[in-house]
């Protein structure tokens, strides 16, 4: 079953994106380089609760 997760910017800690993931196949936390509109730059976004 896919669950909804939130991605937070590693620089400003704001939660900018949501996505879904299958916790059975990917138990580790997700990490993407995405654009943060508050930092005005591409930063690493990590999975949060």
Curated annotation (Swiss-Prot):
Record-level GO cellular component terms: cytoplasm; ribonucleoprotein complex; ribosome
GO terms under biological process: translation
Key words, A-Z: Ribonucleoprotein, Ribosomal protein
A GO molecular-function annotation: structural constituent of ribosome
Stored InterPro entries: Ribosomal_bL33, Ribosomal_bL33_CS, Ribosomal_bL33_sf, Ribosomal_zn-bd
Keyword Ribosomal protein on entry: yes
HAMAP family associated with the record: Ribosomal_bL33 (MF_00294)
Entries under NCBIfam families matching the protein: PRK00504.1 (NF001764), PRK00595.1 (NF001860), rpmG_bact (TIGR01023)
Similarity section: Belongs to the bacterial ribosomal protein bL33 family.
Protein name from the UniProt record: Large ribosomal subunit protein bL33
